[in-house]
C-alpha cells in the first residue's frame, strides 16, 4: 500500500502506519 519504508518493514502492509 502507501506505507513508509520504515513502517512496511515487516508489517502486513495494510496495517495502521506509524510515522517514523
UniProtKB/Swiss-Prot annotation:
Top-rank EC class of the record's enzyme: oxidoreductase
EC annotation from Swiss-Prot or TrEMBL: 1.16.1.7
Regions crossing the membrane: none
Catalytic activity: 2 a Fe(II)-siderophore + NAD(+) + H(+) = 2 a Fe(III)-siderophore + NADH
Tree of life domain: Bacteria
Induction and repression of expression: By Fe(3+) ion deprivation.
Gene Ontology molecular function, alphabetical: ferric-chelate reductase (NADH) activity
Functional note: Reductase activity that acts on Fe(3+)-chelates and NADH as an electron donor and requires the presence of FMN for full activity. May play a role in iron uptake.
Subunit structure as annotated in this protein's UniProt entry: Monomer.
Protein name in the entry: Ferric reductase A
Species the sequence originates in: Paracoccus denitrificans
